[in-house]
Amino acid sequence: MPRAKGGFKTRRYHKKILSMAKGYYSGRRRCYKVAAKAVEKALEHSYRDRRLKKRDLRSLWITRINAAVRMFGLTYNQFIDGLKKANISLNRKALADIAYNDINVFGELVEKVKPFVKAA
């Protein structure tokens, strides 16, 4: 009885891994074992970084809002607190976009918030 080695299924899986390793350098795209490790590591990085991307973008939005608000004499904390008290519900992404693209509109928003901010 001949030895069963997987045949079609193994070949299909190997081809799948090697196609995922396209664009890699040298043995990382040619040798199955090396390519499998490289692809596994790449998938780990992409999984991790999809989550980090969300944190990084939120941090960027907060930085942009803070920089824009300071031009109008407030801090980020005061501004966010004032927004809540003024019942203005804009998320940080939208606020950062307004601050980045249209500083005049953002200035009007800050002026609406200022009466609700406690004098420090």
Swiss-Prot record:
GO cellular component, one term: cytosolic large ribosomal subunit
Domain of life: Bacteria
Any one GO BP annotation for this protein: translation
Gene3D superfamilies: 6.10.160.10, Ribosomal protein L20
Keyword annotations from UniProtKB, A to Z: Ribonucleoprotein, Ribosomal protein, RNA-binding, rRNA-binding
NCBIfam families: rplT_bact
Summary of the function given for this chain in its UniProt record: Binds directly to 23S ribosomal RNA and is necessary for the in vitro assembly process of the 50S ribosomal subunit. It is not involved in the protein synthesizing functions of that subunit.
PANTHER family, per database record: 39S RIBOSOMAL PROTEIN L20
Protein name per Swiss-Prot or TrEMBL: Large ribosomal subunit protein bL20
